[in-house]
């Protein structure tokens, strides 16, 4: 991060299927944030299938100061995003706790790759419709969901959601930043790389080379991230953000 001029980052958990691994990983994420409070905003890993235990873990990590939840990975954790009996209580809990929620979404077309999964943009849109007050981040450009925001009824449901750019290199031309910023607003795009899978430096250079207006670039590279987790995150510099996945 220092080498690439990155002031702060979201440290996201992995979507473990074993709740005990989630608990262990969360202990680590709590420790990271406590050691480097100006550099990292940690997001908890949760197994929704754990039911009441998952909700108890949410309360625990919120009490420890973690700033979000995710990345949920339905395809790897054994449930579907439209399993409402499983997801509704968890999303309601994150909303009540004031925690943003990051969810892995897959493209329904295109090439296959390890970890792609089958989490559809349709289910993502339906989830957002069911929880209009939740702060949801659809990872990996939402599996192409922002392009459907040209449909007014889709845009209306998604107006409070965010998209992160993790793994763009493997999915889209980098013009996707400009296109989504124009269609959906730069205020809803979060810079993310999927580090350490992709290195931050080259990714950041490509984004800066796009010629985005400076206000839009500042929103994408950090201002949106700070607003998402709240002003209590005293990120060093408060200008540049990144998505760091451990």
Residue ranges and their predicted role:
Residues 1-8, 179, 183-190, 197-246:
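Mid-to-C-terminal alpha-helical segments outside catalytic/metal-binding sites
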Residues 23-27, 121, 148, 201:
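Short, surface-exposed alpha-helical segments at coil->helix boundaries
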Residues 48, 144, 196-197:
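Short glycine-enriched loops at secondary-structure junctions
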């Amino acid at each position: 991060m220092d080498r690439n001029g990155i002031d702060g980052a979201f440290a996201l958990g992995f979507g473990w299927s074993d709740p005990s691994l989630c608990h262990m990983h969360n202990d680590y994420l709590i420790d990271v944030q406590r050691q480097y409070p100006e550099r990292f905003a940690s997001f908890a890993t949760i197994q929704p299938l754990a039911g009441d235990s998952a909700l108890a873990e949410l309360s625990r990590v919120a009490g420890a100061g973690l700033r979000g939840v995710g990345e949920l990975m339905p395809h790897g954790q054994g449930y579907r995003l439209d399993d409402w009996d499983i997801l509704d209580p968890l999303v309601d809990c994150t909303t009540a706790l004031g925690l943003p929620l990051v969810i892995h979404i897959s493209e329904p077309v295109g090439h296959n790759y390890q970890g792609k999964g089958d989490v559809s943009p349709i289910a993502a849109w339906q989830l957002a419709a069911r929880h209009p007050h939740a702060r949801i981040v659809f990872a990996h450009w939402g599996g192409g969901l922002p392009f459907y925001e040209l449909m007014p009824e889709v845009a209306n449901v998604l107006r409070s959601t965010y998209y992160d750019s993790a793994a763009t290199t493997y999915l889209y031309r980098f013009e996707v930043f400009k296109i989504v910023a124009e269609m959906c607003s730069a205020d809803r795009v979060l810079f993310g790389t999927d580090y350490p899978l992709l290195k931050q430096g080259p990714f950041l250079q490509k984004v800066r080379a796009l010629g985005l207006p400076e206000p839009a670039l500042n929103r994408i590279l950090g201002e949106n991230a700070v607003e998402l987790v709240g002003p209590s995150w005293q990120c060093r510099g408060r200008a540049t953000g990144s998505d760091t996945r451990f």
